[in-house]
UniProtKB/Swiss-Prot annotation:
Its EC number is 1.8.1.7. Glutathione binds at residues 14, 99, 319. Homodimer. The active site is a redox-active disulfide bond. Its cofactor is FAD. It is found in: Cytoplasm. GO terms for cellular component: cytosol; membrane. Catalyzes the reduction of glutathione disulfide (GSSG) to reduced glutathione (GSH). Constitutes the major mechanism to maintain a high GSH:GSSG ratio in the cytosol. Signal peptide: none annotated. Pfam families: Pyr_redox_2, Pyr_redox_dim. This is Glutathione reductase. NCBIfam families: gluta_reduc_1, PRK06116.1. Belongs to the class-I pyridine nucleotide-disulfide oxidoreductase family.
Length: 450
């Protein structure tokens, strides 16, 4: 007997869970289909375990780089990788349990398996047929790999979280935030780390101040940066080590190589053709601002649409979709402009709005006013490992409306959220000037710039 639902989500990641729970709250009969652990990339091989590892790297840096100058005897003989991984796993298990409890409370049927479209209203899962009035595709994405000889000897970001031990020498290939974060974590935990980027610097899409400062810190503290580095091949040596060969003849031998060159949509195994759902040339599902596909009753949110690939974006889009479909809000949709972003690098980065070059291109040089601040983070200022903290406000027009906020330095990851609200509300430089600073903090620089 075919089972029918009001709403089905294919994919138990951030977007699917958020949307299906919101729909269930409005009395819809819902099902969630997921073949792996709940939580998708973010919880299992992304944001959550990455942040745990970032904290671990911070602790090691505090002990070895900063502790002695604060007067602490920091002689430590051992770092236990297994203990760290066990603690991380236990934390993720608690998140899985939380998801299961909420879905159960909302009477959502969780179906373990892979879904494939039979037609626009019908899915096949584990040999059984189910139908729905509304179907959400939230299958997410997966790491990309280069097409070069020996690519199989490397791992990707998923594989990093399965490492049984910390390698002594690691190469990370990629210039985006995932590559920067992984390289920073591995370097912070004490491995000899190399970061290979195709052009002159990592994070080239960020404001130049961010990229330039990050390169400055990397040159001082690691990881070792290799620019204009285009991989040609990977060779596995007799001792188990790997040699990454570059097109220009350079090479580096390491114990572990991590591909972090980008991600691609995971849409290819659900038989989209049977439903008639359109994808673009890169395989991303084409949606409008309401998350509608070209087929009525089929929607998509998250990384498989090619939108901003961040967990809160998928969550927000999924919830707004359910509000529109099931709570009588016909115009509800996510505004994809001015989405704040944090990179958990060393030091962390926060950014929202337009970069300085983007603002100058959009508004013209004569309409743009930029305010900057550069100082040494207090946390490091009393030590021999001093680290820069740099901030920038990008303003436009006679009223100096703030259209971009950018920073790199200690605490930037936690301070950006509130400033993003201000930018989203249309704050001006005068609004910031009229806000009394909190002292002594790094955040006060944003309201005291001249």
């Amino acid at each position: 007997m075919t089972k029918h639902y009001d709403y089905i989500a294919i994919g138990g990641g951030s977007g699917g869970i958020a949307s299906i729970n919101r729909a269930a709250m409005y009395g819809q009969k819902c099902a969630l289909i997921e073949a792996k652990e709940l939580g998708g990339t973010c919880v299992n091989v992304g944001c959550v375990p990455k942040k745990v590892m970032w904290h671990a790297a911070q602790i090691r840096e505090a002990i070895h780089m900063y502790g002695p100058d604060y007067g602490f005897d920091t002689t430590i003989n051992k770092f236990n990788w297994e203990t760290l991984i066990a603690s991380r796993t236990a934390y993720i298990d608690r998140i899985h349990t939380s998801y299961e409890n909420v879905l159960g409370k909302n009477n959502v049927d969780v179906i373990k398996g892979f879904a494939r479209f039979v037609d626009a209203k019908t899915l096949e899962v584990n040999g059984e047929t189910i139908t729905a009035d509304h179907i959400l595709i939230a299958t997410g994405g997966r790491p990309s790999h280069p097409d070069i000889p020996g690519v199989e000897y490397g791992i990707d970001s998923d594989g990093f979280f399965a490492l049984p031990a910390l390698p002594e020498r690691v190469a990370v290939v990629g210039a985006g935030y995932i590559a920067v974060e992984l390289a920073g974590v591995i370097n912070g935990l004490g491995a000899k780390t190399h970061l290979f980027v195709r052009k002159h610097a990592p994070l080239r899409s960020f404001d130049p101040m961010i990229s330039e400062t990050l390169v400055e810190v990397m040159n001082a503290e690691g990881p070792q940066l290799h620019t204009n580095a285009i991989p040609k091949a990977v060779v596995k040596n007799t001792d188990g080590s790997l040699t990454l060969e570059l097109e220009d003849g350079r090479s580096e031998t390491v114990d572990c190589l991590i591909w972090a060159i980008g991600r691609e949509p995971a849409n290819d195994n659900i038989n989209l053709e049977a439903a008639g759902v359109k994808t673009n040339e890169k395989g991303y599902i084409v949606v409008d601002k309401y998350q509608n596909t070209n087929i009525e009753g089929i929607y998509a949110v998250g990384d498989n649409t090619g939108a901003v690939e961040l967990t809160p974006v998928a969550v927000a889009a999924g919830r707004r979709l359910s509000e529109r479909l099931f709570n009588n809000k016909p115009d509800e949709h996510l505004d994809y402009s001015n989405i704040p972003t944090v990179v958990f690098s060393h030091p962390p980065i926060g950014t929202v709005g337009l970069t300085e070059p983007q603002a100058r291109e959009q508004y013209g040089d004569d309409q743009v006013k930029v305010y900057k601040s550069s100082f040494t983070a207090m946390y490091t200022a009393v030590t021999t490992h001093r680290q820069p903290c740099r901030m920038k406000l990008v303003c436009v027009g006679s009223e100096e409306k703030i259209v971009g906020i950018h920073g790199i330095g200690f605490g930037m990851d936690e301070m950006l959220q509130g400033f993003a609200v201000a930018l989203k509300m249309g704050a001006t430089k005068k609004d910031f000037d009229n806000t009394v600073a909190i002292h002594p903090t790094a955040a006060e620089e944003f309201v005291t710039m001249r």
